[in-house]
Design a protein with these regions (language model features):
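AAA+ P-loop NTPase catalytic core and its hallmark functional loops
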Residues: 1-223
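Alpha-helical lid/collar subdomain of P-loop NTPases
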Residues: 1-18, 35, 202-207, 211-309
Length: 309
């Protein structure tokens, strides 16, 4: 009932929140299969990875489940600047009683391991190899972390949980959409006990989510506009699969389009500044045709034509 889906599972929860518990979004709509995977992770200490296209709400999904369980949640973005030192910790010079001394400052991983925290590694397939091997140590359920510099072994808290999100499934990117991602060691992928896929939603679900996120459009006329926006997004997704265009509208893009349409009072202009202007100029006539098919009006000529000098 808490998640609006029909499943019979007992999941532990905390009676009180803390500063690390995400805020509840009352408009959030849960995907049944993804929610089931995340709840299994919380209830049975499974290592859960959620894979899917950008903007589908993978990280938010984990956060919103954690929010309703009052479970502290910490997200770490595995960009190329996150290093082994950031995760494990380092020696730092500190002042104590007027003297400079060297003291070990633990990183985010030892800190989280010792606490009832759900740790989420975002952009998991973009992590550096040295960072990935640190994570591999704690992927087992009893995953103890050995700090060699400190001669210390950290045992995970009984309510520590580990999640990850990725655009690819560890086999690299063949679409060209996700530069910076890389193949993941299959011995490491084997340690993720549940891998869920969260891709684009049905037209009805996506329309309901956008109407909930942008209440100004939650009436008969507004819903017609939202349905046209979702239809346009689906055309870009079909066009991408067919190889006609190289950029797709994610659910996040559609929400941004609706928000900008509310700000400007003009869907045509909102579409141009939200999506069209970041697309390849050669592909803009195709996108203009998609727009015309969904909204029944032409985009301004100057927004489409490519200037040849």
């Amino acid at each position: 009932e808490t998640f609006g889906i029909d499943i019979d599972m007992e999941v532990p929860a905390f009676s009180q929140g803390s500063e690390h518990v995400p805020a509840i979004d009352p408009t959030y709509r849960f995907d049944r299969d993804t929610t089931l995977a995340i709840l299994a992770g919380f209830a049975h200490n499974r290592r859960v990875m959620i894979q899917g296209y950008h903007g589908t709400g993978k990280s938010t999904h984990i956060e919103q489940v954690a929010a309703r369980l009052n479970w502290p949640c910490v997200r770490v973005n595995l960009d190329s600047h996150i290093s082994r030192i950031d995760l494990i910790g380092k020696d730092a010079i500190v002042l104590r009683d007027g003297k400079q001394i060297t003291e070990f400052r633990e990183g985010i991983l030892p800190w989280a391991l010792k606490r009832p925290v759900a740790m989420v590694f975002d952009e998991y397939d973009a992590g550096r190899p040295d960072v990935m091997f640190v994570i591999q140590r704690v992927l087992e359920v009893d995953g103890k972390l050995t700090l060699l510099d400190q001669n210390k072994v950290i045992h995970p808290h009984s309510h520590f949980r580990l999640f990850a999100t990725s655009n690819t499934v560890g086999l690299g990117d063949t679409t060209g959409l996700y530069h910076g991602t890389q193949q993941i060691n299959q011995a490491q992928m084997d340690r993720w006990s549940i891998i869920a896929t969260l891709n684009y939603l049905s037209v009805e679900d996506e329309t309901n989510i956008i109407a909930a996120k942008v209440p100004a459009f939650d009436d008969a006329e507004g819903r017609q506009k939202i349905e046209a926006m979702v239809a346009l997004a689906n055309l870009t997704r079909q066009g991408f699969v067919a190889g006609d265009i190289s950029t797709v509208m994610s659910p996040r893009t559609v929400i941004t389009l609706a928000e900008n349409a509310k700000i400007f009072g003009d869907v045509s202009y909102a579409f141009r500044v939200t999506f069209l202007n970041r697309c390849d100029e050669v592909e803009r006539p195709i996108l203009a045709e998609y727009y015309q098919r969904c909204f029944g009006e032409e985009l301004p000529e100057e927004a489409i034509n490519v200037m040849v000098r």
